[in-house]
Amino acid sequence: MEYNVVLLGVTKTACKVRASLMNRILAFVDDVYEDLELWYPKIRLEEEGWEVIVAGPEVGKVYRGKNGYPCPADATISEMRCEDFDALLIPGGFAPDKLRRDPAVVALTRAFHKQDKPIAFICHAGWICISADILRGRKATSTIGIKDDMKNAGAIWVDQDLVIDGNLISSRTPRDLAVFAKALVAQLRTDRSLETA
């Protein structure tokens, strides 16, 4: 299988070594999340040895995906700290439109970006990155439905299945999930190998 990929700033010399990887990934959830965009990367990351903590507005609440698949929240977003995680996973669906209004979601997303930790977002998840104002001058992709929003927020929008610009990893739709999850796992493996080198 061949993929069209835009890669920027991912050479070994450009990578920053992050202190003490926790082997933990934070994922956001709320009602009407895109089922596959949460579960596919979550399962892949767990297969590779990462613990994925799914945080929603309320701990213990069971959130329903667009297709009805349930996801209980392991934690409350407002209690999460960037320092406790290696990366941020933001699935799409319509949940990001609600989550972007939560100051804790915006602050956490900015904190991951400021600490140069991977932020993997797909489909409508770009809405959260827009509200966090982390896309200005950066290459990224999304579902075509929010292309104008992304561009108006200063992103250099690229119509490709995977776009990596430094710590930002983005894909368009569920059809791009294989390459999306593979890229996030590869980035985390690189970070892990740099830490142990």
Segment roles from a protein language model:
Residues 3-115, 119, 128-137, 147-197:
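Extended, subdomain-level signal for the structured scaffold at the beginning of enzyme domains
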Residues 143:
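Active-site-adjacent substrate-recognition loops and nearby beta-strands
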Residues 122-124:
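Short, thiol/selenol-centered motifs that function as redox-active sites or metal-ligating centers
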Residues 140:
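Anionic-ligand binding patches
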